[in-house]
Amino acid sequence: MQSLKLAEWLFPLVVSGEKTHTIRWREPRMHPGPMRYVCEGDTEKTVVVLVTRCEDVPLSQAAALVGKQDIWPDKVMLSGMREHYPDIELDDVVQVVEHLTPRQTEAAHAGKSD
């Protein structure tokens, strides 16, 4: 199963279902299917989500893709992304990874016949 380390402060947002996407730059490629998030501050904490879509777009278009353009204007988006990727620019292509919440993932898995 693909896995991805996630900043400790973001981990509860995934668990609660508030965070349903991640934006990656120059990282291993994600693909639709199960994905395990691993909390960077405590690697014993993990949660599985179902990746539903992966799309490559310039960073300047990523906020609109996930419906956050009102709260993530370019300046805010660039500042936030530079906390993780200091050299990133608005015209750099990023991978936007969208996924179900953990609860939706469990329900989707339970609905599959083995």
Q: What do these predicted ranges mean?
A:
Residues M1-D114:
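Structured alpha/beta reader/binder surfaces that contact nucleic acids or chromatin modification marks
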